[in-house]
UniProtKB/Swiss-Prot annotation:
Keyword Magnesium: no
PANTHER family the UniProt entry points to: GLYCINE CLEAVAGE SYSTEM H PROTEIN (PTHR11715), GLYCINE CLEAVAGE SYSTEM H PROTEIN-RELATED (PTHR11715:SF3)
Domain of life: Bacteria
Subunit text: The glycine cleavage system is composed of four proteins: P, T, L and H.
Similarity field: Belongs to the GcvH family.
Keyword Endoplasmic reticulum in annotation: no
Free-text remark on how the cofactor is bound: Binds 1 lipoyl cofactor covalently.
InterPro entries tied to this protein: 2-oxoA_DH_lipoyl-BS, Biotin_lipoyl, GCV_H, GCV_H/Fam206, GCV_H_sub, Single_hybrid_motif
Protein name according to UniProt: Glycine cleavage system H protein
The gene coding this protein: gcvH
NCBIfam families associated with the record: gcvH, PRK01202.1
Species whose genome carries this gene: Prochlorococcus marinus (strain NATL2A)
Modified residues (N6-lipoyllysine): 65
Length: 128
């Protein structure tokens, strides 16, 4: 399967994406990660107001194959979580880069985005 990643996305080694959305950062998991997981049946996300730290687990996604932790690509405070994905995990399955986003955070250090892979580098990584 060929994957397409938006140019403005930045990616962590653990397959989470992040991108600046005004002064906030939107976080999700890549289409590649969703494909590897298979049918997603459950998503667990922290409450709004929770602080997350870059590289630390912030929730999990459960599929028919496995339960995988998700890791924060940047540090910050959760200002919004996608409750639609919690109620209907298939939204993550069907549109991970759009309606299937997971969190919006107020970043502690927006420069952390620059430490993540750009779309081209991430595409090469998953193709290797």
């Amino acid at each position: 399967m060929a994957f397409s990643f938006p140019d403005h996305f930045r990616f962590a080694d653990s397959h989470e994406y992040a991108f600046a959305d005004d002064s906030l950062v939107r976080i999700g998991i890549s289409e590649f990660a969703v494909d590897q997981l298979g049918d997603i049946v459950f998503v667990d996300l922290p409450e709004e107001g929770t602080a997350i730290a870059k590289g630390e687990s912030f929730g999990s996604v459960e599929s028919v194959k496995a339960v995988e932790d998700m890791y924060a690509p940047v540090s910050g405070e959760i200002v919004h979580r996608n409750n639609s994905v919690l109620a209907s995990p298939e939204e993550l399955q069907n549109d991970p880069h759009g309606e299937g986003w997971l969190l919006i955070i107020r970043p502690d250090n927006p420069a952390q985005l620059k430490e993540l892979m750009d779309s081209e580098t991430y595409s090469k990584k998953i193709s290797a």
